[in-house]
């Protein structure tokens, strides 16, 4: 049975593009991206969606009095679109528990580090890679996980390690992790979900 996917974004949408490309190659199983929802007007991710013929929506954070008000509006929109899977792809909003309650084990996020390292409140974008380099790790990578009420705390679906090199800058490491891990892991996880190959037992995710 086909599954409707909504991708939530705030910026350029490089992970969205990886999903669009995978969809074009028939690599999302029975899943179809039917909506791209941005928290910012003018986000380039909306242009990516338009070029792919995917409907775009904008829910500007500044128009809502609180994150909860925005979350409730988002849930209404998702339900109206009959969404089965929500993917956070560079979305900078911390949604409240109502979203998780509406979509238990049906919201995926990609994080640019190997959780539980360099994750949680405040760890996003280049800052993650700055902290990894500052700590001196030899491996970093990416994690795709289900979203829970705890920031970056949901069950881990997939991880991929990426080498950290002595001359890396945060920007160089970010690019390598995107290319070698994020853009591969996320479409694979979405495909597994859409093919009903994922089961969750407590904190353990099993992919058949």
Model-derived regions: residue spans:
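One-carbon transfer enzymes
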Residues: 1-208
